[in-house]
Protein backbone atom coordinates (compact mmCIF):
# COMPACT_ATOMS: atom_id res chain seq x y z
CA UNK A 1 0.00 0.00 0.00
CA UNK A 2 1.27 3.46 -0.86
CA UNK A 3 -0.15 4.81 2.33
CA UNK A 4 -1.17 2.67 5.26
CA UNK A 5 -3.46 5.34 6.68
CA UNK A 6 -5.49 5.53 3.48
CA UNK A 7 -6.00 1.78 3.41
CA UNK A 8 -6.73 1.78 7.13
CA UNK A 9 -9.58 4.25 6.69
CA UNK A 10 -10.96 2.21 3.80
CA UNK A 11 -10.92 -0.88 5.99
CA UNK A 12 -12.60 0.87 8.91
CA UNK A 13 -15.35 2.04 6.56
CA UNK A 14 -15.70 -1.50 5.20
CA UNK A 15 -16.20 -3.03 8.66
CA UNK A 16 -18.33 -0.09 9.84
CA UNK A 17 -15.91 0.85 12.60
CA UNK A 18 -15.85 4.39 13.95
CA UNK A 19 -13.13 4.81 16.60
CA UNK A 20 -13.73 7.19 19.46
CA UNK A 21 -11.31 10.03 20.14
CA UNK A 22 -9.01 7.90 22.30
CA UNK A 23 -8.86 5.04 19.82
CA UNK A 24 -7.96 7.49 17.07
CA UNK A 25 -4.70 8.16 18.92
CA UNK A 26 -3.81 4.50 18.57
CA UNK A 27 -4.76 4.32 14.91
CA UNK A 28 -3.19 7.59 13.82
CA UNK A 29 -0.85 9.31 16.31
CA UNK A 30 -0.43 13.08 16.00
CA UNK A 31 1.79 14.33 13.20
CA UNK A 32 5.25 15.67 13.86
CA UNK A 33 8.06 13.71 15.42
CA UNK A 34 5.92 10.55 15.40
CA UNK A 35 5.70 10.59 11.60
CA UNK A 36 9.32 10.54 10.51
CA UNK A 37 10.44 10.52 6.88
CA UNK A 38 11.38 6.84 7.23
CA UNK A 39 7.91 5.96 8.49
CA UNK A 40 5.33 8.41 7.10
CA UNK A 41 2.42 6.18 8.13
CA UNK A 42 2.92 6.82 11.84
CA UNK A 43 4.88 5.85 14.90
CA UNK A 44 6.41 2.37 14.76
CA UNK A 45 5.98 1.76 18.46
CA UNK A 46 2.78 2.78 20.24
CA UNK A 47 2.14 2.39 23.96
CA UNK A 48 -1.48 2.74 25.05
CA UNK A 49 -2.17 2.81 28.78
CA UNK A 50 -5.95 2.63 29.03
CA UNK A 51 -8.73 1.62 31.36
CA UNK A 52 -10.90 -1.45 30.95
CA UNK A 53 -13.73 0.35 29.18
CA UNK A 54 -11.52 1.91 26.49
CA UNK A 55 -11.94 -0.82 23.89
CA UNK A 56 -8.21 -1.34 23.44
CA UNK A 57 -8.49 -5.00 22.43
CA UNK A 58 -11.09 -4.12 19.82
CA UNK A 59 -9.04 -1.27 18.34
CA UNK A 60 -5.89 -3.43 18.34
CA UNK A 61 -7.84 -6.11 16.46
CA UNK A 62 -8.79 -3.53 13.82
CA UNK A 63 -5.08 -2.73 13.38
CA UNK A 64 -4.33 -6.42 12.98
CA UNK A 65 -7.03 -6.76 10.32
CA UNK A 66 -5.59 -3.87 8.33
CA UNK A 67 -2.24 -5.64 8.15
CA UNK A 68 -3.29 -9.26 7.67
CA UNK A 69 -5.66 -8.40 4.80
CA UNK A 70 -2.62 -7.34 2.78
CA UNK A 71 -0.40 -9.89 1.04
CA UNK A 72 2.79 -11.32 2.56
CA UNK A 73 2.19 -10.05 6.09
CA UNK A 74 2.84 -11.57 9.50
CA UNK A 75 0.99 -10.47 12.63
CA UNK A 76 1.59 -11.73 16.15
CA UNK A 77 -0.59 -11.23 19.21
CA UNK A 78 1.59 -11.72 22.29
CA UNK A 79 0.04 -11.84 25.74
CA UNK A 80 0.82 -13.17 29.23
CA UNK A 81 -1.02 -16.40 28.36
CA UNK A 82 -2.78 -18.06 25.44
CA UNK A 83 -6.10 -17.37 27.13
CA UNK A 84 -5.38 -13.64 26.92
CA UNK A 85 -4.09 -13.63 23.34
CA UNK A 86 -7.20 -15.54 22.27
CA UNK A 87 -9.38 -12.47 22.83
CA UNK A 88 -7.93 -10.34 20.02
CA UNK A 89 -7.40 -13.41 17.84
CA UNK A 90 -11.09 -14.27 18.15
CA UNK A 91 -12.17 -10.72 17.26
CA UNK A 92 -10.10 -10.87 14.07
CA UNK A 93 -11.37 -14.34 13.17
CA UNK A 94 -14.99 -13.35 13.70
CA UNK A 95 -14.64 -10.24 11.54
CA UNK A 96 -12.71 -11.77 8.65
CA UNK A 97 -14.14 -15.27 8.50
CA UNK A 98 -17.58 -15.14 10.13
CA UNK A 99 -18.71 -11.63 9.17
CA UNK A 100 -16.90 -11.01 5.87
CA UNK A 101 -16.69 -14.58 4.64
CA UNK A 102 -12.99 -14.71 3.78
CA UNK A 103 -11.84 -18.31 3.40
CA UNK A 104 -8.68 -19.11 5.37
CA UNK A 105 -6.11 -21.44 3.86
CA UNK A 106 -5.41 -22.72 7.37
CA UNK A 107 -7.10 -22.23 10.72
CA UNK A 108 -6.52 -23.69 14.17
CA UNK A 109 -8.37 -22.33 17.17
CA UNK A 110 -6.26 -24.39 19.56
CA UNK A 111 -2.97 -23.15 18.12
CA UNK A 112 -4.38 -19.70 17.34
CA UNK A 113 -3.22 -19.66 13.73
CA UNK A 114 -5.12 -18.06 10.86
CA UNK A 115 -3.71 -17.94 7.32
CA UNK A 116 -5.01 -16.42 4.10
CA UNK A 117 -3.78 -16.89 0.55
CA UNK A 118 -4.22 -13.49 -1.08
CA UNK A 119 -3.46 -12.77 -4.74
CA UNK A 120 -0.02 -11.41 -3.88
CA UNK A 121 0.97 -14.00 -1.30
CA UNK A 122 0.12 -15.62 2.02
CA UNK A 123 -0.49 -13.71 5.24
CA UNK A 124 -0.77 -15.07 8.77
CA UNK A 125 -1.94 -13.95 12.18
CA UNK A 126 -1.25 -15.99 15.27
CA UNK A 127 -1.62 -15.74 19.03
CA UNK A 128 1.40 -16.40 21.23
CA UNK A 129 2.09 -16.66 24.94
CA UNK A 130 4.98 -14.86 26.60
CA UNK A 131 5.13 -17.84 28.96
CA UNK A 132 6.87 -19.70 26.14
CA UNK A 133 9.62 -17.42 24.75
CA UNK A 134 10.87 -20.15 22.41
CA UNK A 135 7.70 -19.57 20.40
CA UNK A 136 8.73 -15.96 19.82
CA UNK A 137 11.71 -16.86 17.65
CA UNK A 138 11.60 -17.01 13.89
CA UNK A 139 9.87 -15.14 11.11
CA UNK A 140 9.97 -11.40 10.66
CA UNK A 141 6.79 -9.61 11.68
CA UNK A 142 4.95 -6.66 10.21
CA UNK A 143 2.97 -6.05 13.39
CA UNK A 144 3.19 -7.35 16.94
CA UNK A 145 0.44 -6.53 19.42
CA UNK A 146 1.41 -6.99 23.06
CA UNK A 147 -1.85 -7.34 24.95
CA UNK A 148 -1.95 -6.68 28.71
CA UNK A 149 1.75 -6.01 28.35
CA UNK A 150 2.15 -4.63 31.87
CA UNK A 151 1.33 -8.14 33.09
CA UNK A 152 3.84 -9.95 30.88
CA UNK A 153 6.56 -11.42 33.13
CA UNK A 154 10.04 -10.24 32.17
CA UNK A 155 8.58 -7.81 29.62
CA UNK A 156 11.94 -6.08 29.15
CA UNK A 157 13.63 -9.35 28.21
CA UNK A 158 10.74 -10.50 26.04
CA UNK A 159 10.77 -7.21 24.13
CA UNK A 160 14.50 -6.75 23.71
CA UNK A 161 15.58 -10.36 23.10
CA UNK A 162 12.66 -11.82 21.21
CA UNK A 163 10.11 -9.40 19.81
CA UNK A 164 12.15 -6.35 18.82
CA UNK A 165 14.49 -8.40 16.57
CA UNK A 166 11.52 -9.84 14.65
CA UNK A 167 10.56 -6.31 13.61
CA UNK A 168 13.93 -5.28 12.21
CA UNK A 169 13.95 -6.74 8.69
CA UNK A 170 10.46 -5.58 7.75
CA UNK A 171 10.57 -2.37 9.78
CA UNK A 172 7.53 -3.76 11.55
CA UNK A 173 5.39 -2.04 14.15
CA UNK A 174 4.55 -2.86 17.76
CA UNK A 175 1.50 -1.86 19.77
CA UNK A 176 1.65 -2.22 23.54
CA UNK A 177 -1.78 -2.11 25.18
CA UNK A 178 -2.48 -2.52 28.86
CA UNK A 179 -4.30 -1.28 31.90
CA UNK A 180 -2.09 0.70 34.32
CA UNK A 181 -0.06 -1.47 36.67
CA UNK A 182 2.76 0.12 38.66
CA UNK A 183 6.06 1.48 37.42
CA UNK A 184 7.73 -1.49 35.73
CA UNK A 185 8.91 -2.01 32.17
CA UNK A 186 5.57 -1.05 30.67
CA UNK A 187 5.82 2.33 32.37
CA UNK A 188 9.40 2.72 31.06
CA UNK A 189 8.16 2.01 27.53
CA UNK A 190 5.35 4.49 28.06
CA UNK A 191 7.94 7.15 28.89
CA UNK A 192 9.78 6.40 25.65
CA UNK A 193 6.67 7.52 23.83
CA UNK A 194 7.09 10.93 25.42
CA UNK A 195 10.76 11.37 24.55
CA UNK A 196 11.91 9.16 21.66
CA UNK A 197 11.39 9.43 17.93
CA UNK A 198 9.16 6.80 16.32
CA UNK A 199 7.59 6.07 19.72
CA UNK A 200 4.24 7.42 20.81
CA UNK A 201 2.35 6.86 24.05
CA UNK A 202 -0.93 8.02 25.51
CA UNK A 203 -3.21 7.23 28.41
CA UNK A 204 -6.97 7.32 28.63
Regions found by a protein language model. Give the residues of each.
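Phosphate/NTP-binding elements of NTP-utilizing enzymes
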Residues: 1-204
Amino acid sequence: MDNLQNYKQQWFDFVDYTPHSGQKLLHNPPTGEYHSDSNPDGARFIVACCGRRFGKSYSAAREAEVVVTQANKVVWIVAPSYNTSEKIFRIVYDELVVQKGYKPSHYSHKEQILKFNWAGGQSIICGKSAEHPSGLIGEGCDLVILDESSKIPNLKRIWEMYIRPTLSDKKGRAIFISTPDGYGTFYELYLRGKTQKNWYSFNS
